[in-house]
């Protein structure tokens, strides 16, 4: 029996005929976007059809959609795997569209019994790709591919239906710009305004449909459509992560869900993918098993939910008068119902309701027998899909009825009926969507945060908390939301505000649109990590569960800037992804909005071994403990300009225990050698009152005070707030020839085995071990003996030299792997911004009054031992807002030519890569050779200063070196002194000769014109305030960031231009002196 197909024009032309005399409707099998879908038959032939009756009394836009659908169906009727169109008829204000009837039902319905095997997914995707290949050749975009629009016939054939929003791409412009489709299946380019798209959007929707079939629901189905659209644009594409899925299926979804439409494969290419080829030979008849499984599931759960083919009782299109299917395909019963059905058409709800094709008229026993289905091959109902489903509301399918809670009768909660307020009077009522028993596991949080928030009519929110926190690996447990919340009197729980009571969320300003305008207040200091232990800060995939409840999605297109952890003496609490963003690369340093002040000194700890004293600068923003590490790789935001980084943290440095000697700040204090016989070992040089520059916008001033006295080899460590960001250079496993990548415009990559995940390393002191005894690493003012320097070299417990360097001729130049490991603490200090009030320590006159001759290094004056190269008295610097900060590691190349650093305008970090002569990135900042630069206020071209007698009482020799101030010059002159590696020094040279050489080097530096610029005397403190008073009593916000950046650049430029002279001085001072084994 065949029927003459009629296209749209013919159908409309023949509309004068009474269509009811040609086709009879028997029952309602679903409701579409604009009308009701009936099951009917042709009166003459008895062939069954699907009759879509549309009401044309709606808006003109909807009429155009109907006409478009008819047009596409007429043009695509010869394509396989697409619901065939037979014609359309106009009756009064109703349009009858005659279509192929797919008795099997929608794929969405077949998913109800539970998870389906991948063999079925492969066949379904293969058939859909064949359909898409054909329509894409005709430049037609379906734009609404989802499981509900995929029909399965009784024979197992796959049909793609519902072309209501399909679009024809014309030949002149092969791309579209209008938004259409269902939000949860939309491609990012469809959602973004002003972005053109093509047929590749169907490939994205196909990938989401595959994800839906595999997991039960599309991504973001637990949030509203508008929020889901934002997440689709800003988040990374969904991926299947569970181990139960095959690699080929994961790959197929990844190929479909490519962010770049150009890289997204076409339907023809996807047919050649591994997943499709694996199921190439599987026949479509295997899908009959899915139909049989559903029919058995339906019979088993008849009493727990309504049959899908019937319309809910509260809806206007109640099919009470629709006839039941008859054995003769129609008959008198169908004839009697025509009038009532016509009235029903006029009462159709015009709401946007999902198409729900019916196959419940089939008998399970008859179907299984007729098709010879092997019941043993059918997968049993997967009960785990139903567990914990009751706490999720599916916004992707909001109009699906609440059929059941789980396949068993263990249901203790009342039903919620969609479209009514029945059951909503109880605080424990859950908005239920159980069309899909998606596999989830309960996500519990600790008692601080509710795991469920339920909106009830009593203006209260019921909460439920459970025991220890666990996490699911598949789907997320979100705070449910009732469909009719907008009509409730209580406060609406939205996806944005329901999470604020639970855990801090990533700032909304950190997005792909305005990441550069992020406010410092948007970041949470790490102290909140101990309170909010379950902040999920690394959501890479939208379908993975959060560690805290609530719909706390956020964008992943711009990585979250890391939070700052300040308490490293306590183990970080919370899950492995709490609060800290671990990054294997250096992070740019943000300018603090307030000037960090060092806190008052605190009593020294009785047991310094238990206190981790310092940590690398980059650890302040990337530090993570093994318990809080993650596998996320930090990706710097593309639109955030990278600032100069003063640290180049290496991940391979390990923490070391604190012993009883001075931290290896080398000659960090600008103090001379006193020849006073009763010179004691007590010293407090280089009080590292270092304020870490607030990174990531944090205003926390991380300061550490390390006042170390050594009267009896007892080390005391005073810490406050956080550890100092001093750079511990333990060169374990490192090479001195390795140049760190110090470009401020790019991140510094490390090996995959090295990450900044370890706790911040502890500063390693100069212990009694034989590997840290270089004479230049010992403070010159703290000789641990009151005798001469000659006797020091014979002291077996405090050796100042090591034969490891000088006993071997091959290691005479010190350019070897041991130098970095044995000289970890060379560093340079530089001042941070100072307050408006002029500090007395910065005044050269005040500093001069503290000394006999106005210069540090005077013999016999103990107060001069604490004046560093910037004129700061470090003994009292702990109470003033003056900080020192170390520089990064440097490459060693003593034999190379001295290079001049590039201009600051090219954003090159000369401290990391431009100066090959700098030792490990740390220069000897102490005034070893008596270089006096205490005249802070002097100009750059200042002449020779007062004579500085550097007295080194060695028993028979006194050396006086006439030193001058090093003035900064615009270009560094080339050195005329031979490199250290070319200098030969007799083996009997003692320490006094080295000091003499150092003093000579200082004079040679001055003769070459090197100089250092004095530090700034004062800074305008108002640049740290974002408010200014423009009228009495009124203030306005002003952007001070450019001014602060300018001041920082000036400081860095001063620091850069002072490096050549320091390098030159180091080159002259670091002399290899061979010493016999029996002389040390």
UniProtKB/Swiss-Prot annotation:
Modified residues (Phosphoserine): 735
Residues at the catalytic site: 144 (proton acceptor)
Cellular component aspect of the GO annotation: cellular bud; cytoplasm; incipient cellular bud site; mating projection tip
UniProt feature, compositional bias: Polar residues: 615-626, 656-673, 693-726, 743-756, 901-913
Reactions it catalyzes: L-seryl-[protein] + ATP = O-phospho-L-seryl-[protein] + ADP + H(+); L-threonyl-[protein] + ATP = O-phospho-L-threonyl-[protein] + ADP + H(+)
Keyword ATP-binding: yes
EC numbers on record: 2.7.11.1
GO molecular function, one term: protein kinase activity
Entry-linked PROSITE patterns: PROTEIN_KINASE_ATP, PROTEIN_KINASE_DOM, PROTEIN_KINASE_ST
GO BP term (any one): fungal-type cell wall organization
Alphabetical keyword list: ATP-binding, Kinase, Nucleotide-binding, Phosphoprotein, Serine/threonine-protein kinase, Transferase
Enzyme class: transferase
Region (Disordered): 308-347, 615-760, 787-831, 901-956
Domain Protein kinase, first and last residues per copy: 23-276
Ranges of biased composition (kind: Basic and acidic residues): 808-821
InterPro entries: Kinase-like_dom_sf, Prot_kinase_dom, Protein_kinase_ATP_BS, Ser/Thr_kinase_AS, STE20/SPS1-PAK, STK_Kic1p-like
Pfam families: Pkinase (PF00069)
CDD domains hit by this protein: STKc_NAK1_like
Keyword hit for Phosphoprotein: yes
Biased composition range(s): Low complexity: 312-326, 627-638, 674-689, 787-807, 918-956
Binding site for ATP: 29-37, 52
Quaternary structure annotation from Swiss-Prot or TrEMBL: Interacts with CDC31.
Miscellaneous note of the record: Present with 1040 molecules/cell in log phase SD medium.
Family: Belongs to the protein kinase superfamily. Ser/Thr protein kinase family.
Name of this protein: Serine/threonine-protein kinase KIC1
Organism: Saccharomyces cerevisiae (strain ATCC 204508 / S288c)
Lineage: Eukaryota, Fungi, Dikarya, Ascomycota, Saccharomycotina
Protein's gene: KIC1
């Amino acid at each position: 029996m065949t029927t003459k197909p009629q296209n749209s024009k013919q159908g409309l032309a023949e509309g004068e005929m009474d269509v009811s005399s040609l086709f009879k409707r028997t029952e309602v099998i679903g409701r579409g976007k604009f009308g009701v879908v009936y099951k009917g038959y042709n009166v003459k032939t008895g062939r069954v059809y699907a009759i879509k009756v549309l009401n044309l009394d709606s808006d003109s836009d909807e009429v155009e959609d109907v006409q478009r659908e008819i047009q596409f169906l007429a043009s695509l009727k010869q394509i396989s795997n697409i619901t065939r169109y037979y014609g359309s008829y106009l009756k009064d204000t109703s349009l009858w569209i005659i279509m192929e009837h797919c008795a099997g039902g929608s794929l969405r319905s077949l998913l109800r019994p539970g998870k389906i095997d991948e063999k079925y997914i492969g066949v379904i995707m293969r058939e859909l790709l064949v359909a898409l290949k054909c329509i894409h050749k005709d430049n037609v975009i379906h734009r609404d591919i989802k499981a509900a629009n995929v029909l399965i016939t009784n024979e197992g054939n796959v049909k793609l239906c519902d072309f209501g929003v399909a679009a024809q791409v014309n030949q002149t412009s092969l791309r579209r710009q209008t938004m259409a489709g269902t939000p949860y299946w939309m491609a990012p380019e469809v959602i973004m305004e002003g972005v053109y798209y093509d047929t590749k959007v169907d490939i994205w929707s196909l990938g989401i449909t595959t994800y839906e079939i595999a997991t039960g629901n599309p991504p973001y189905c637990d949030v509203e459509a508008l929020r889901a659209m934002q997440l689709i644009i800003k988040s990374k594409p969904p991926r299947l992560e569970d181990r139960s899925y095959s690699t080929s299926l994961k790959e197929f979804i990844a190929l479909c869900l490519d962010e770049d439409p150009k890289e997204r494969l076409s339907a023809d290419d996807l047919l050649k993918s591994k997943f499709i080829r694996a199921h190439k030979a599987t026949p479509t008849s295997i899908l009959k098993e899915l139909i049989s499984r559903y029919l058995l599931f339906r019979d088993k759960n008849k009493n727990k939910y309504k049959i899908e083919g019937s319309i809910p009782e509260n809806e206007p299109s109640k099919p009470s008068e629709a006839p039941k299917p008859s054995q003769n395909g129609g008959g008198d019963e169908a004839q009697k119902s025509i009038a009532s059905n016509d009235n029903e058409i006029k009462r159709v709800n015009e709401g946007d309701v999902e198409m729900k094709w019916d196959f419940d008229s089939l008998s399970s026993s008859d179907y299984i027998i007729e098709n010879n289905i092997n019941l043993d091959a059918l997968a049993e109902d997967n009960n785990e899909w139903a567990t914990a489903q009751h706490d999720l509301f599916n916004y992707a399918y909001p109009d699906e009825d609440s059929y059941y809670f789980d396949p068993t009768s263990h249901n203790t909660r009342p039903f919620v009926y969609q479209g009514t307020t029945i059951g909503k009077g109880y605080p424990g009522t859950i908005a239920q969507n159980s069309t899909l028993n998606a596999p989830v596991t309960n996500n519990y949080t600790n008692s601080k945060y509710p795991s469920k928030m339920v909106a009830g009519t009593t203006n209260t929110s019921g909460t439920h908390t459970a025991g220890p926190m666990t996490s699911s690996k598949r789907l997320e447990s979100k705070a449910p939301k009732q469909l009719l919340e907008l009509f409730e009197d209580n406060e609406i729980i939205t996806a944005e505000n329901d999470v604020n009571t639970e855990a801090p969320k990533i700032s909304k300003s950190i997005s792909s649109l305005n990441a550069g305008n992020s406010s410092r207040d948007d970041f949470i200091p790490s102290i909140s990590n101990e309170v909010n232990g379950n902040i999920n800060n690394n959501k890479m995939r939208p379908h993975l569960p959060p560690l805290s409840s609530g719909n706390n999605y956020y964008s992943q297109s711009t990585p979250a800037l890391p939070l700052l952890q300040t308490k490293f003496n306590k183990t970080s609490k919370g899950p492995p992804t709490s609060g800290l963003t671990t990054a294997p690369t250096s992070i740019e340093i943000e300018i603090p909005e307030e000037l960090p002040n060092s806190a008052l000194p605190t009593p020294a700890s009785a047991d310094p071994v238990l206190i981790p004293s310092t940590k690398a600068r980059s650890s302040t923003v990337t530090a993570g403990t093994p318990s809080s590490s993650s596998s996320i790789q930090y990706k710097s935001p593309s639109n955030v300009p990278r600032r100069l980084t003063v640290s180049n943290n290496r991940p391979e440095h390990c923490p070391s225990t604190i012993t009883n000697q001075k931290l290896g700040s080398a000659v960090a204090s600008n103090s001379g050698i006193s020849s006073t016989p009763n010179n004691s070992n007590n010293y407090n040089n280089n009080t590292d009152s270092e304020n870490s520059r607030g990174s990531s916008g944090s205003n926390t001033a991380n300061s550490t005070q390390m006042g170390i006295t050594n009267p009896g080899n007892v080390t005391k460590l005073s810490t406050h707030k956080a550890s100092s960001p001093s750079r511990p250079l333990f060169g374990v496993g490192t090479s001195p020839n390795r140049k760190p990548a110090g470009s401020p415009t790019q991140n510094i990559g490390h090996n995959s085995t090295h990450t900044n995940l370890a706790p911040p390393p502890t500063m390693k002191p100069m212990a009694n071990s034989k590997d840290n005894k270089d004479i230049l690493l010992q403070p010159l003012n703290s000789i641990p003996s009151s005798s001469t320097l000659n006797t020091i070299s014979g002291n077996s417990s405090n050796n100042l030299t090591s034969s490891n360097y000088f006993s071997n001729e091959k290691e005479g130049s010190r350019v070897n792997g041991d130098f970095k490991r044995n000289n970890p603490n060379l560093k340079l200090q530089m001042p941070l911004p100072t307050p408006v009030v002029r500090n007395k320590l910065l005044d050269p006159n005040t500093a001069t009054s503290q000394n006999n001759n106005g210069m540090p290094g005077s013999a016999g004056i103990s107060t001069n031992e604490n004046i560093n190269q910037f004129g700061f008295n470090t003994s009292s610097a702990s109470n003033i807002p003056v900080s020192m900060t170390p520089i990064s590691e440097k490459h060693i190349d003593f034999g190379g030519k001295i290079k001049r650093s590039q201009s600051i305008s090219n954003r090159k970090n000369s401290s990391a890569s431009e100066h090959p002569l700098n030792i490990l990135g740390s220069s000897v900042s102490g005034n070893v050779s008596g270089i006096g630069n205490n005249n802070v206020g002097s100009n750059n071209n200042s002449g020779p200063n007062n004579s500085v007698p550097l007295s080194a009482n060695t028993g028979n020799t006194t050396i006086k070196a006439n030193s001058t101030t090093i003035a900064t010059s615009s270009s560094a002159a080339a050195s005329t002194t031979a490199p250290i590696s070319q200098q030969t020094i007799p083996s009997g040279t003692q320490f006094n000769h080295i000091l003499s050489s150092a003093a000579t080097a200082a004079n040679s530096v001055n003769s070459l014109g090197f100089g250092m610029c004095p530090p700034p005397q004062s800074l305008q403190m108002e640049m740290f305030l974002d408010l200014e008073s423009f009228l009495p009593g009124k203030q306005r916000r002003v952007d001070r960031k450019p001014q602060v950046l300018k001041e920082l650049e000036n400081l860095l430029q001063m620091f850069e231009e002072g490096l050549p002279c320091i390098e030159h001085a180091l080159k002259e001072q670091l002399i290899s002196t061979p010493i016999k084994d029996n002389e040390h």
